[in-house]
């Protein structure tokens, strides 16, 4: 289901039967409708970015709800798929902040220690936030709590009001939070553009001796 270190730590935070409840939920929703991402990719963020290698968290709300978009990594789509509006704005801000990146697939960020986590890990086709409040939030809150308990600094990048509410879970003063409005077209011009999250994260990582992320890779 998840990388073993994540699993071991998360199960210490959740009620004992919570993984079983998640599996029952997944069995039901995938058997009765079209759900994204593909089931094999539901936990991809935790599989690609091991706990011990996580340096940055970028928190999304839920997966893209159109065909072939969601990969199990927040904001990412395959390179063969047009960038959705929020991702277009993320790449526009990246270009202004550091440089041009010509890929829509953000897997290389995840492989460098950027945990691309959605607060809800599944979504019904065509229904944004359709699985909100059903099963996922305690699980993904547990992920944040596990990171909060780490004794090595993590940079939490929180975009938009929903993600910024999770700041209450980040109580360990060793960590760093970068927050701004969401990259959605509805809010990007209210402070996301010009917020320079990528260079700011790298400056923090460099200062902490953790090495920079190659955001253009």
Swiss-Prot record:
One GO term of the biological process aspect: base-excision repair, AP site formation via deaminated base removal
Keyword annotations: Cytoplasm, DNA damage, DNA repair, Hydrolase
Reaction catalysis annotation: Hydrolyzes single-stranded DNA or mismatched double-stranded DNA and polynucleotides, releasing free uracil
Subcellular location: Cytoplasm
InterPro entries according to UniProt: UDG_fam1, Ura-DNA_Glyclase_AS, Uracil-DNA_glycosylase-like, Uracil-DNA_glycosylase-like_sf
EC number(s) per entry: 3.2.2.27
Cited SMART domains: UDG, UreE_C
Gene Ontology molecular function, alphabetical: uracil DNA N-glycosylase activity
One Pfam family named in its UniProt record: UDG
Active-site residue list: 62 (proton acceptor)
GO cellular component terms attached to this protein's record: cytoplasm
Keyword Metal-binding found: no
Database matches in SUPFAM superfamilies: Uracil-DNA glycosylase-like
Highest rank taxon of the organism: Bacteria
Biological role: Excises uracil residues from the DNA which can arise as a result of misincorporation of dUMP residues by DNA polymerase or due to deamination of cytosine.
PANTHER family the record matches: URACIL-DNA GLYCOSYLASE (PTHR11264:SF0)
Family: Belongs to the uracil-DNA glycosylase (UDG) superfamily. UNG family.
The protein's name: Uracil-DNA glycosylase
Provenance organism: Streptococcus equi subsp. equi (strain 4047)
